[in-house]
Design a protein with these regions (language model features):
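Interfacial helix-loop-helix linkers and transmembrane-helix boundary segments
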Residues: 94-99, 197-200
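TM-adjacent membrane-interface loops and short helices in multi-pass inner/ER membrane proteins
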Residues: 251, 380-419, 426-429, 433-440
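Transmembrane alpha-helix boundary signature
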Residues: 65-97, 113-131, 137-142, 148, ...
Length: 508
């Protein structure tokens, strides 16, 4: 929260117009990124990755312009996270403003960590010659064993950082319709958003969920068609058989990870919309239908880890929603009949998702579940080969993004499997970042999870927040045995959910 202070430069009408242009451009660009990211084959190719990078940098520039107008020229646009007239910043030690500043500092520290690792590189790997070219480096600073891959990692995550902070700043801004009551009443309005959520957040969640539902439908049709062409267009270099891929993702587990991140968000969003609208309008049930399709997709994809995570979130999410429905006071405008129907719809959602998954995926998934122990044994052998890397470079690691090239030095023979990803993001992060970089990541995630308990911000409905936490927890659990955080579209969605959480508070 910015403190009121005399502006350094006078505010002009053109500045206000420029601010609104930047806000509108941020919204449109963000919507493009939400749709583009998964459909562009999961953003796994250089052309799609750099499209997202440039879009992220553009969001960063737009954010810098907005912060400049607010900070240097004293512009105070109506925002849901701004204190009302006569109200000071929230009291207490744990405030949203302090956590936001701490997370901003951690973001800069992480980017600096990666940048120093690339600039202070100890080696560059030449793929044409399969050899390392070693350089002098400062040993007590982070350093990379493949400068090229670490630079790629830096540019990608600079774009993600810009996107994250642009979304954090854009979401609590008020739309024109939300600003009008402020103008009419001279600012004396409630700071609680209509329909329980601000309009921009509702718009973002609608787009995420409907886009995810369409993505899921395409993936199901593609699996039934069985040609092995991603989006019916391209045959990937790896996983060319239809059962190994799903939708635009060449690896079925990545598709499952994306859907398991998104469908709990849709379910929580539907619950909030149902509570606010009841049965006066029925359009919000499209959110439930899209979430149902997405919840079935991890099972249909035949990803073993994805199916287990789906089942876990379904059980925990349903138990939580039903329990809180009966334990806490109902919505004042909700009748007992409407409450019962809502619970019936929730239970029906779970049963329908499992039935849909069973109908289209169980026949292929069952043999893979019976071989789960064998699959884990194979991965544990790779983990055992990789663990000495973490032991040899415990503090700074081998450098962000360098696992692929450094792992070859630890293979027992040329016959040893040489993976591009370790299929264990927890261990790979420990190897490439060391405990120093890993601590920064853990602190940043901790700040996001603590944000809801801090004072100040947008009212965050308890049920929606818990389902967002479950979505993040499911992705983190799956990361123990796979590589969701090596896929840009999944990481982008993970950060979008974190940006939403960074605006929520149980005590605005």
């Amino acid at each position: 929260m910015m403190k009121d202070r005399p502006p350094r430069y006078p505010l002009r009408a053109g500045d206000v117009q420029l601010y609104h242009v930047c806000e509108d451009a941020t919204g449109w660009l963000l919507q493009f990124m939400v749709v583009f990211s998964p459909w562009a084959f999961g953003t796994t190719q250089p052309w799609s990755l750099w499209t997202m990078n440039v879009a992220g940098y553009t969001l960063g520039v737009l954010l810098a312009v907005k912060l400049g107008i607010r900070g240097l020229k004293g512009h105070r646009p109506p925002r849901w996270d701004a204190p009302g007239p006569g109200r000071s910043s929230p009291p207490g030690q744990l405030t949203g403003a302090r956590l936001t500043k701490a997370l901003a500092a951690l973001s800069l520290a992480l980017l600096a960590y990666v940048w120093i690792s690339a600039v202070n590189a100890h080696a560059t790997y030449h793929r044409d010659a399969l050899s390392f070219e070693y350089h002098d480096c400062i040993a007590w600073l982070p350093h990379s064993f493949d400068s090229a891959l670490t630079w790629n990692f830096f540019w990608a995550h600079l774009g993600l950082a810009c996107s994250f902070w642009a979304v954090c700043d854009w979401l609590p801004g008020k739309t024109g319709d939300e600003e009008r009551p402020v103008m009419v009443s001279g600012g004396a309005v409630s700071d609680r958003a209509p329909d329980l959520l601000p309009a921009r957040l509702r718009r973002l969640l609608w787009l995420l969920v409907i886009n995810g539902g369409l993505l899921g439908l395409e993936g199901i049709v593609q699996r039934l068609e069985g040609s092995g062409l991603l989006l019916f267009l391209v045959q990937p270099r790896i996983n060319q058989d239809a059962v190994s891929q799903f939708g635009p993702y060449a690896y079925r587990a990545n598709a499952a990870q994306y859907f398991n991140l998104l469908w709990p968000v849709g379910l929580g969003f539907w619950w909030i919309l149902q509570r606010a609208r009841g049965f006066r309008r029925h359009t919000h049930h499209w959110v439930l239908a899209s979430s149902l399709v997405m919840a079935a997709c991890p099972i249909i994809s035949t990803s073993r880890g994805g199916a287990v995570i789906t089942l876990g979130i379904l059980v925990l999410g349903t138990v939580f929603l039903v329990a809180t429905h009966f334990l806490f006071a109902p919505n004042p405008g909700e009748s007992k009949r409407a409450g019962r129907v809502k619970v019936v719809l929730l239970v029906g959602f779970c049963l329908a998702a499992l039935a849909l998954g069973y109908a289209f995926g169980w026949k292929s998934l069952l043999p893979r579940l019976s071989q789960m122990e064998e699959g884990f044994e194979g991965r544990e052998e790779t983990y055992a080969t990789a663990r000495p890397m973490a032991e040899d470079y415990p503090v700074f690691g081998t450098g962000p993004g360098t696992f692929e090239t450094v792992f070859q030095l630890y293979r027992i023979s040329t016959d040893t499997y040489w993976p591009v990803q370790l299929h264990n993001d927890w261990l790979e992060t420990r190897i490439t970042f060391g405990w120093a970089g890993g601590a920064l990541i853990a602190l940043a995630l901790g700040a996001v999870l603590l944000r809801w308990f801090a004072r100040g911000g947008v009212h965050g409905p308890r049920r929606l927040v818990v389902l967002l936490w479950l979505a993040l927890a499911g992705c983190l659990a799956h990361a123990r045995y796979d590589f969701p955080f090596q896929i840009h579209s999944i990481e982008f969605l993970f950060l979008l959910i974190c940006a939403v959480l960074m605006n929520f508070s149980r005590r605005p």
